[in-house]
Amino acid sequence: MTEPKRAIVLLSGGLDSATCLAIARNAGFDCYALSIAYGQRHTAELAAARRVAQSLDAREHRLAHVSLGEFGGSALTDSSIPVPIEGAVGGIPVTYVPARNTVMLSIALAWAEVLGAHDIYVGVNAVDYSGYPDCRPEFIAAFEAMANLATKAGIEGARITIHAPLIRLSKAGIIQRGTALGVDYAQTVSCYQADEAGRACGVCDACRLRKAGFEAAGIPDPTPYR
């Protein structure tokens, strides 16, 4: 009897990570969903992650805690920094959380080693992204190289692969792909400042990208807006 293929899927509760989970499942993996409470402004996305993990049949869903909010430095972790509502203005925005994807992928890598999983999925995107340096293909390639140098599995020849299947897709393309795979986007939360019920502000950069994506995809937007 062959061992099941296992993959760790980073699951924020947003549109992209939900699509990523559906893609990993469709690729035949037993999916172990990992959400991170890092000190973000709201917990609505973590509640969304629980819903998505259940509806997309994750084998297990874990919530890890790391206190990036202790350091601040981002509008998503420091309530004294306002979330921009004027749209993207160029450069690295204040919604960038320093080292967030590096930290999250490192935690995913630790769980992967424990489970004997050699595949990690992350929903980063370099097309409709907001200027985050840790959403670029170069970052993913560099982290994968590090993972294969820094782990027992890598040293023993079991190659670790970081999958970023959305990295070249537009937001519309992501939505179309996820819809075809049965993702219920009404369960997801993308807004940077959603209320505790998960209702979106409709004006932050994440909301703008989400709205435009559904419109371009020709699919009704199920997002509840305040």
Curated annotation (Swiss-Prot):
Its EC number is 6.3.4.20. The keyword Transcription does not apply. Zn(2+) binds at C191, C201, C204, C207. Transmembrane segments: none annotated. InterPro entries: QueC, Rossmann-like_a/b/a_fold. Pathway: Purine metabolism; 7-cyano-7-deazaguanine biosynthesis. Its cofactor is Zn(2+). CDD domains: QueC-like (cd01995). Pfam families: QueC. Keywords: ATP-binding, Ligase, Metal-binding, Nucleotide-binding, Queuosine biosynthesis, Zinc. It catalyses: 7-carboxy-7-deazaguanine + NH4(+) + ATP = 7-cyano-7-deazaguanine + ADP + phosphate + H2O + H(+). GO terms for molecular function: ATP binding; ligase activity, forming carbon-nitrogen bonds; zinc ion binding. One of its GO terms (biological process) is queuosine biosynthetic process. Binds 1 zinc ion per subunit. ATP binds at L11, S12, G13, G14, L15, D16, S17, A18, T19, C20, L21. Coiled coil: none annotated. Gene3D superfamilies: HUPs. Belongs to the QueC family. Catalyzes the ATP-dependent conversion of 7-carboxy-7-deazaguanine (CDG) to 7-cyano-7-deazaguanine (preQ(0)). This is 7-cyano-7-deazaguanine synthase. It comes from Aromatoleum aromaticum (strain DSM 19018 / LMG 30748 / EbN1).
